[in-house]
């Protein structure tokens, strides 16, 4: 089973792809989709959509895992992140890819065993769990791999 994990954002959207074969979970790839600040929001969302669809077509995931929105102090940021999430939900839905949402607490708990772990702890565990040479960069990609890991350990495949 191939899983794409997403750390939603509109400036930087992280993705991570894992393969689960019985009880073995392995790293396929990871990266980010970035947009420029001076580009209108509707064009940024269109760009995110197009790049994400390319990932879906290239890697053919069986499931998509995405981090749910958590509390944002800045309402405008929350709205824009929600819009970027909507683009991911739409692209997945159009291709009949099942989508699973996880809270930041669930992701941290599944990866580290502690739901209040900090970002560095999560990144170190992602490196260790996936047997990578280095912590995935940028942070958004590491977070996306953590989201994918969360689904990989919870789903029966």
Curated annotation (Swiss-Prot):
EC number: 3.1.21.10
Database matches in SUPFAM superfamilies: Ribonuclease H-like
Subcellular location: Cytoplasm
GO cellular component: cytoplasm; Holliday junction resolvase complex
Region forming the signal peptide: none
InterPro entries per UniProt: RNaseH-like_sf, RNaseH_sf, X-over_junc_endoDNase_Mg_BS, X-over_junc_endoDNase_RuvC
Gene3D superfamilies: Ribonuclease H-like superfamily/Ribonuclease H
Active-site feature positions: 7, 67, 140
Cofactor note: Binds 2 Mg(2+) ion per subunit.
Chain residues that bind Mg(2+) 1: 7, 140
Main location: cytoplasm
A single GO molecular function term of this UniProt record: crossover junction DNA endonuclease activity
Residues that, per the record, bind Mg(2+) 2: 67
Needed co-factor(s): Mg(2+)
Enzymatic reactions: Endonucleolytic cleavage at a junction such as a reciprocal single-stranded crossover between two homologous DNA duplexes (Holliday junction)
GO biological process: DNA recombination; DNA repair
Superkingdom in the source lineage: Bacteria
Keywords, in A-Z order: Cytoplasm, DNA damage, DNA recombination, DNA repair, DNA-binding, Endonuclease, Hydrolase, Magnesium, Metal-binding, Nuclease
Entry-linked PANTHER family: CROSSOVER JUNCTION ENDODEOXYRIBONUCLEASE RUVC
Stated role: The RuvA-RuvB-RuvC complex processes Holliday junction (HJ) DNA during genetic recombination and DNA repair. Endonuclease that resolves HJ intermediates. Cleaves cruciform DNA by making single-stranded nicks across the HJ at symmetrical positions within the homologous arms, yielding a 5'-phosphate and a 3'-hydroxyl group; requires a central core of homology in the junction. The consensus cleavage sequence is 5'-(A/T)TT(C/G)-3'. Cleavage occurs on the 3'-side of the TT dinucleotide at the point of strand exchange.
Family: Belongs to the RuvC family.
Subunit organization: Homodimer which binds Holliday junction (HJ) DNA. The HJ becomes 2-fold symmetrical on binding to RuvC with unstacked arms; it has a different conformation from HJ DNA in complex with RuvA. In the full resolvosome a probable DNA-RuvA(4)-RuvB(12)-RuvC(2) complex forms which resolves the HJ.
HAMAP family the record matches: RuvC
Name the record gives this protein: Crossover junction endodeoxyribonuclease RuvC
Organism: Thermosipho africanus (strain TCF52B)
């Amino acid at each position: 089973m191939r899983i794409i994990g997403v750390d939603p954002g509109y400036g930087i959207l992280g993705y991570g792809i894992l393969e689960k074969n019985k009880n073995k979970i392995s790293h396929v790839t990871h990266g980010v989709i970035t947009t420029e600040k001076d580009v209108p929001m509707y064009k940024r969302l269109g760009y995110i959509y197009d790049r994400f669809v390319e990932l879906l077509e290239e890697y053919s995931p069986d499931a998509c895992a995405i981090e749910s929105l958590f509390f944002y102090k800045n309402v405008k940021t929350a709205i824009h992140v929600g819009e970027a999430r909507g683009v991911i939900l739409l692209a997945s839905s159009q291709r009949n890819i099942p989508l699973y949402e996880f809270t930041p607490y669930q992701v941290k708990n599944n990866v580290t065993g502690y739901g209040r772990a900090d970002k560095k702890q999560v990144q170190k565990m992602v490196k260790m769990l996936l047997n990578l040479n280095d912590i995935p960069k940028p942070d958004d990609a590491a977070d996306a791999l953590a989201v994918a890991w969360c689904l990989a350990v919870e789903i029966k495949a």
